[in-house]
Amino acid sequence: MTDAAQRISELRNELDAHNYRYYVLDEPSVPDAEYDRLFRELQALEAEHPELVTPESPTQRVGGEALSAFGEVRHEVPMLSLGNAFEEDDLRAFDRSVQSGLGLAGGDLFGGGAEVEYSCEPKLDGLAVSLRYENGQLVRGATRGDGSTGEDISANVRTIRNVPLKLQGEGWPQVLEVRGEVFMPKAGFEELNARQAEAGGKTFANPRNAAAGSLRQLDPKITASRPLEFCCYGVGQVSGELPGTQVAMLQQLKAWGIPISRELKLAKGVEACLDYYRDIGQRRMSLAYDIDGVVFKVNNIEDQQQLGFRARTPHWAIAHKFPAQEELTELLDVEFQVGRTGAVTPVARLKPVKVAGVMVANATLHNMDEVARLGVMIGDTVIIRRAGDVIPQVMAVVPERRPADARPVHIPEQCPVCGSAVERTQLIKRSKGKASVSEGSVYRCVGRLSCQAQLKQAIIHFVSRRAMDIEGLGDKTIEQLVDEKLIGSPADLYKLTYEQIIGLEGFAEVSSNKLLAAIENSKRPSLARFIYALGIPDVGEETAKVLARSLASLERVRQALPEVLTYLPDIGLEVAHEIHSFFEDAHNQQVISALLGECGLELQDEGELSAEFSAVATLGGMLDKLNIPTVGPGAAQKLAERFGSLEGVLNGDWLDMRQALPERQAKAVREFFDETANAQRARAIEQQLREFGMHWESEKKVAEGLPLAGQTWVLTGTLEVMSRDVAKEKLESLGAKVAGSVSAKTHCVVAGPGAGSKLAKASELGVKVLDEAQFLEQLKSYGIEA
């Protein structure tokens, strides 16, 4: 090694050590002037010896060449969002849910229960990112995006001063993906805005907007000039072992040079969590950065894995949000807007006022029921809040300030956009047993797609990135297409011609051809994307994925009865009715038929019903779903055990019915099925369960030929080649049942690194144990690759 190379290596190591002490330990070891001197010396040496410059050198944070666009990054482990708690009772309910999920006493409302350990840290108000290290070197940075796919911001994250370009120490996993928040400290935000104002540039409303805008610059040199910082809160994909608790894992990351929260604490029990929340809340304004709450996570990693996930949120973590900031202002007027589903909703026009750093002139009033509840009138002084520090809403009226000329708010009789009638629909909650309960009302424009507001919103949703992903069809272009009457439904997009497009404002030959190509390229969507694009009320992206993954064909989704849909994860009866009603609508049927017929769309991943839902129904469960008055799950199961079939229940005599149930319930069952419509409905549900392969009598057929049928397996510890969710799916596809605890009936336990009590229990009971390599070999023997 030459003298220059030796000195460069020494300087890099010394500067990395100073950065670690400054940003991670908060213990500066040298004055800023000394750091700057060392940095300039390194710059000079690298300028003299450019062949010695490496990507991880501290001098390379200044940013490289500008990009034309961000690349796409698929997250191997999805970056999920957190559920929210807004009140102390919400957090206590979360704690009870955790205890129940872990099988601890106290999972009910009144039990004491064991105290669960939680990690506690502030919820930074910034942008979630992923940093991937391979062999200790930073190789990629990505935004959260939609949780499954983000943007490649590697060049930009390398410019953030406290992000280590290479890890400290030793023993890190070969692949280590850390997740955290990029944010802008308050002081840096004020300095940036002062510089922007002095230069005549755009100032930012708040530190979060400044951080997001700075991180997503195509020119990394701009990002390098912004005072951004990173704080790690967890990990994603890891090939190797990490400590078995959240706090110990974060402390290990800190030892490797990854910055973590200085406010990280361990709390035992929910009351200690609430103490932490109150303490941070009191110190919130004095912190060097903006926060909007506190995050609590079950500390034990194996417990986290046992608790699992909902569609988009973990069962083992929650964000306890702070109350939103509020201000007083005047309600100048109420206007009405029309949404994608025709809902006519009131919007408050306000005298502009600054709330949480943002100038607010409009706020949501939600619906006319909320207007009535508030008793709000035009001219009132109102309290507005930025809910979640994002969406402004009217919270209350100050009645003593009401002027004499205040005017009541009236819903228009005609749609403000198309002039069609506005009709009031009562929202009914179909409660279990029995009596339907009103949940307020909604006013809708009956114009449907003849209403330009509804049509525009429907098309905007249809072409959006997470739906059909037709690039080049922005909101303004869609407005032109609708205003010029070139499209009247989503199907008309596929009939557009070059001559029609080039006549639009902002389009020339190249852009017109690009748009036509984008429309053509969208003709082979996944089933989930297509379902989401249809804009079914209450069906978001995750519910669309559930429908596609579970039923695996559009025809099954279209035919599915509401009660059958409720067998799918996270689909309740209300959403099921929305789905069923949407596909029963004649106009919707016409649009779908046009898309799949003359427009030439081909859905790519249709197939057989997911094995997870084969024979998922039981007779007792189906009877319970019929909502027979006074008959709950227990009584429904007694009926199933007594009669053995639906026809047996329908035709059973009074004596048999009374032997199964008390007189009051037996009478309710008899009266329910005496109504022909109810009996027909029950038979229709059972018939569809048979057709879909979900009927309880399908179980024997499903089990035939499946090598693990009748076996119960348990997964524990960390699996490196595949996630535990994937392993569970593969086992279930072979006929196995995957349980959360070990018993004498357990056939086999798959144990990865970090396996704890379940592995010990398996050894105690003499249950067969496989490590991951052996498990993969067994899967391979059945023709299933990892």
From Swiss-Prot:
BRCT domain mapped to chain residues: 703-786
What UniProt keywords apply to this chain's record, in alphabetical order? DNA damage, DNA repair, DNA replication, Ligase, Magnesium, Manganese, Metal-binding, NAD, Zinc
Its GO CC terms are: cytosol
Enzyme active site: 123 (n6-amp-lysine intermediate)
Q: Name one GO molecular function term.
A: metal ion binding
Q: Which SUPFAM superfamilies match?
A: BRCT domain, DNA ligase/mRNA capping enzyme, catalytic domain, Nucleic acid-binding proteins, RuvA domain 2-like
Q: Name one GO biological process term.
A: DNA replication
Give the EC number(s) listed in the UniProt record: 6.5.1.2
Its needed co-factors are: Mg(2+); Mn(2+)
Swiss-Prot/TrEMBL catalytic activity: NAD(+) + (deoxyribonucleotide)n-3'-hydroxyl + 5'-phospho-(deoxyribonucleotide)m = (deoxyribonucleotide)n+m + AMP + beta-nicotinamide D-nucleotide
Keyword Manganese listed? The answer is: yes
Binding residues for NAD(+): 32-36, 81-82, 121, 144, 181, 297, 321
Keyword Magnesium tagged: yes
Q: Where does Zn(2+) bind?
A: 415, 418, 445, 451
Classify the source by domain of life.
Bacteria
Role: DNA ligase that catalyzes the formation of phosphodiester linkages between 5'-phosphoryl and 3'-hydroxyl groups in double-stranded DNA using NAD as a coenzyme and as the energy source for the reaction. It is essential for DNA replication and repair of damaged DNA.
User: Member of which family?
Assistant: Belongs to the NAD-dependent DNA ligase family. LigA subfamily.
Q: Which PANTHER family match?
A: CHROMOSOME TRANSMISSION FIDELITY FACTOR 18 (PTHR23389), DNA LIGASE (PTHR23389:SF9)
This chain's protein is named: DNA ligase
What does the record give as the organism's lineage?
A: Bacteria, Pseudomonadati, Pseudomonadota, Gammaproteobacteria, Pseudomonadales
